[in-house]
Amino acid sequence: MASITACVGNSRQQNAPLPPWAHSMLRSLGRSLCPLVVKMAERNMKLFSGRVVPAQGKETFENWLIQVNEVLPDWSMSEEEKLKRLMKTLRGPAREVMRLLQAANPNLSVADFLRAMKLVFGESESSVTAHGKFFNTLQAQGEKASLYVIRLEVQLQNAIQAGILAEKDANQTRLQQLLLGAELNRDLRFRLKHLLRMYANKQERLPNFLELIKMIREEEDWDDAFIKRKRPKRSEPIMERAASPVAFQGAQPIAISSADCNCNVIEIDDTLDDSDEDVILVVSLYPSLTPTGAPPFRGRARPLDQVLVIDSPNNSGAQSLSTSGGSGYKNDGPGNIRRARKRKYTTRCSYCGEEGHSKETCDNESNKAQVFENLIITLQELTHTEERSKEVPGEHSDASEPQ
């Protein structure tokens, strides 16, 4: 050992670098002494209880925070181990509050731990600020009541330290604000109100912070278990249909059957540029039971020469127009009836006789004789149309029956 010391001393006097074996020895010595130094520092750390007047052997919050900030850089360990060592320095209310906070937030870091300690036990705020923060602390949307009570306790301790609330009234004030600012189930709310009425003059009998947390968590566990038992299980096809609606995805007809009326309602999806009203057809599934000659029921009457039959794109047939004696719908078999739509007519000008515009927007400068001639031609066409319809009176009704 003496030779090693002499060699190290001579090397340092000559400003020469240390040999490799010296570096290895110093690293081993540091690894051996580091845990011992940390344990000695832990034994010398003062404890903090969270009380307004610290007991013998306990420190104020400011002194406790100073020594924690001094030893934290020397703790070369995980965040979880650091939190465990910090918890060992707490006693009384401070330990219980931080234990509950850690239970509510399993991923709590050291920085968040110290920030919460400052909020609960740090410097007192002004009386006006502390008063406003406490009485304006409300339960957030989706927040559990147990977590809300922890937030409320932080503001309550600040208000007590600011001197606006008496410590002997803490239990009553906590309960009153909880009933005002939290959404509780009916049973728990009734129990807490009953306790307030029963012990109005014996506030020491009211539940304190820890007892209140226990009551709330028992109710939350019961509610969670009850909801899991009563929650209905949805079938797989229904959820898939709800997740991916079929509306406006194609022209495939949808049939809705009813056991009471034995009929089908056929619907074909519209295109985006079709603004016409649709005709909904309700046809019996059993044509043999329908009285002879009775026309099928329609949701709304349509002129027979104003309908357009639209087939599904999956069918081989193309779109077809109905004639003046057409029925307005197509029957490909039992229960396979397509819905009909109105035909879009072009506009004819009564002034010049051309199509594509009306009389009010006509730009042609024709004489009155031309106007009268066009009018006579139009009247003749209407007369011939009426005569042809009278010659075949039963053509409409015969063609409208489904085959």
Curated annotation (Swiss-Prot):
Pfam families tied to this protein: PNMA (PF14893)
Sequence ranges of Basic and acidic residues compositional bias: 383-403
Keywords: Metal-binding, Zinc, Zinc-finger
Keyword Metal-binding recorded: yes
Zinc finger motifs (CCHC-type), residue ranges: 347-364
Compositional bias per record (Polar residues), positions renumbered to this chain: 312-324
Single Gene Ontology MF annotation: zinc ion binding
Record family assignment: Belongs to the ZCCHC12 family.
Name of the protein in question: Zinc finger CCHC domain-containing protein 18
Organism: Homo sapiens
